[in-house]
């Protein structure tokens, strides 16, 4: 069954997981309000990645008006328009649930050395994937 799902859901260049736990990402999520579809951007730190293959999910945490907000996104959801990598974080844990108990400067994550180069490579890869996608649809 998993093999069938892998064949149906072939990961394209935009959809491959280009982030890990501790990275700051912007998730462009499509929502429908009163019959209109718009894209909402949710920016935060990835605190966990769960499951495997087609059911893979990731949890993004951000602090909004002094309240921590976490949202779980399925990686292969058709409602996700784009996942944009903002910065690479240096962490030594697979799950960052301890960030829930921290506030302010204590909740910061150090940036990975060479992270800016990785972010720029990711942007170039996404632009190239978008360009090839637009040429194939025309």
From Swiss-Prot:
GO terms for cellular component: cytosolic large ribosomal subunit. PROSITE patterns: RIBOSOMAL_L19 (PS01015). It comes from the Bacteria. Keywords: Ribonucleoprotein, Ribosomal protein. InterPro entries: Ribosomal_bL19, Ribosomal_bL19_CS, Ribosomal_bL19_sf, Translation_prot_SH3-like_sf. GO terms for molecular function: structural constituent of ribosome. Coiled coil: none annotated. Pfam families: Ribosomal_L19 (PF01245). GO terms for biological process: translation. Gene3D superfamilies: 2.30.30.790. This protein is located at the 30S-50S ribosomal subunit interface and may play a role in the structure and function of the aminoacyl-tRNA binding site. Belongs to the bacterial ribosomal protein bL19 family. This is Large ribosomal subunit protein bL19. It comes from Leptospira interrogans serogroup Icterohaemorrhagiae serovar copenhageni (strain Fiocruz L1-130).
């Amino acid at each position: 069954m998993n093999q069938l799902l892998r064949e149906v859901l072939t990961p394209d260049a935009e959809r491959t997981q280009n982030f890990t736990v501790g990275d700051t990402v912007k998730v462009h999520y499509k929502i429908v309000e009163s019959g209109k579809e718009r894209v909402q951007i949710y920016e935060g730190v990835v605190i966990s990645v769960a499951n495997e293959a087609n059911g893979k999910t990731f949890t993004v945490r951000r602090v909004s008006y002094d309240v921590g907000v976490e949202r779980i996104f399925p990686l292969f959801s058709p409602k996700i328009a784009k996942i944009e990598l903002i910065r690479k974080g240096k962490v030594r844990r697979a799950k960052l649930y301890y960030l829930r108990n921290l506030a302010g400067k204590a909740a910061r994550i150090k940036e990975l050395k060479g992270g800016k180069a990785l972010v720029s490579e990711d942007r170039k890869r996404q632009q190239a994937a978008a360009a090839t996608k637009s040429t194939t649809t025309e």
